[in-house]
Amino acid sequence: LLEFNLGKNKPYESLFAIKTQRTSNDTYFRAHDINTGLVNSANTNLINEINYNFKKDNMFFDVKAQAFEDLRKNKDKYEYILPNITFGKNFFSEKFGFLDFKSNIYHRNYEGNKYTTFLNNDLLWSPGSFITERGFLNTVEGMVKNVNYEAKNTTDLKTSGTINELSSVISFKSSLPMEKSREDSSKTFSPTFMVRYAPGQMKSLRDDDVF
């Protein structure tokens, strides 16, 4: 692993990294039970990647190219993700609160002739928390997710041209911080109530970081 700090003494963070893994024998690590800081015998994948990260103030930009080799396979053992680009920016307004935008585009080639290209856009809105006269702490958050993709020779995705999907969810959470005091101790607890609503066609987001 080679890392180059390009943002040293600069008003931003900039890092370029190269990672390479190679072996002359597909079963060498497992046969000899090699475990070091760089190699784990239980890991059957070799990873080679180039990564560039840039961050300044409320904006970040990542570019990555990756190649994977599955040592357990004799054919279709390679997987490529190129490019893999992520851009994100955070906004804040006294009136509307926090707004986080993230966009990611990547192209994947795996199992020989399978291809997927994704463009994902996420918009997360959080106006902040507010306390009612009765002491309830309320929080509202909303997210809009736009997924665009093309797939070829896959069975788990649609392959009929460019697919566009749009989903949204809004969340309301309310809690009541309470304290129980004794002469020698005190305990705090907060009963919490949460409601989520996803208008339109619902799509599983369990693998995504939602709230």
Task: Give short role names for the model-derived ranges.
Residues L1-F211:
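Outer-membrane beta-barrel proteins and related beta-barrel translocases across Gram-negative bacteria
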